[in-house]
């Protein structure tokens, strides 16, 4: 009986660890609410190209393209200090970036559900460059 109880405890610990390593999804509404509340434990990371970022991005987001994230990861600050919400245009590059971040030890990771396409389609706030004369 003791060995069964021990097995259940060990299995629970393993499952909990496995779940903690997988990034959670965050809905656009939930991200908006956290941003509006001034949440200082939040970092929004846009992993699209610089050209895409310059065309429009989520307010307060920082841009590190997914293909150079490994080289520039120190720009995100100490591992584990903030929740990192990652997005790209539609999801593929964000998944690659999330794997890079997990490999670097980040564990407070979130993937924006629907990425930038959904965010902008829902009419949420977007920073766009001012029109040039």
Language-model features: locations:
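Rhodanese-like catalytic fold shared by cysteine-dependent sulfurtransferases
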Residues: 2-5, 12-42, 50-83, 92-133
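Phosphate-rich cofactor/ligand-interacting catalytic cores and adjacent structured alpha/beta frameworks
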Residues: 46
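Short, surface-exposed ligand- or partner-binding patches at beta-edge/loop junctions that are enriched
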Residues: 87
